[in-house]
């Protein structure tokens, strides 16, 4: 993962950047902050689906800075009364997603397949993730604007999908281009991940709607259409 190779940059962006934002929120009396956290804060926890009250044990510097950011947000809320929603996003995917960062596996696969290049899978492909469509994430963010107090909410489908299953979804839209190579597991990678979305449904009344196969189809076709 990028943060393992660039811990200084990860800290500068995720922590120093957040503090700059929060200080200006305090200064200009901003009433509400919505924060993009990550499933990475949970670490390699086998209690799937993971709920928001579990102990956090991140395995990457990215997860550490996201966890620390949540504490900064909580204290700013307690000191200055800023309404805050911490969204712990599962693996978000969708049209126009970049190929960088910690969670862009779908867009990376799109880029490689569209270019006729082999896809590299780190590990045996049985590691799982919770893939949530960007449109469903947008619905959660919109609903979060009205939230009061301090809330921590997973944004997820609550469904485990292995990387091999993800490749199966890609095979349905780009079977003639799909070539897979397996490599050693990367340091800091999590083996299983799926997040409970009970709180998302209860507090924000949002239920993710997009099915993975349809979402992959939309994302890949958009990628090819735009000639990326």
Q: Positions of the model-derived regions?
A:
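Short glycine-/acidic-enriched loop or helix-start segments at secondary-structure transitions
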Residues: 2-3, 44-46, 96, 131, ...
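Residues at the N-terminus of a long alpha-helix
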Residues: 57, 99, 130-133
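N-terminal Rossmann-like NAD(P)+-binding domain of SDR-like oxidoreductases, especially those catalyzing
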Residues: 1-92, 206, 222
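C-terminal substrate-binding subdomain of Rossmann-fold SDR/epimerase-dehydratase oxidoreductases
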Residues: 113-228
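Hydrophobic alpha-helix immediately C-terminal to the catalytic Tyr-X-X-X-Lys motif of short-chain
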Residues: 68, 72, 76, 109, ...
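Conserved donor sugar-nucleotide recognition element shared by glycan-biosynthetic enzymes
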Residues: 61, 69, 102, 163, ...
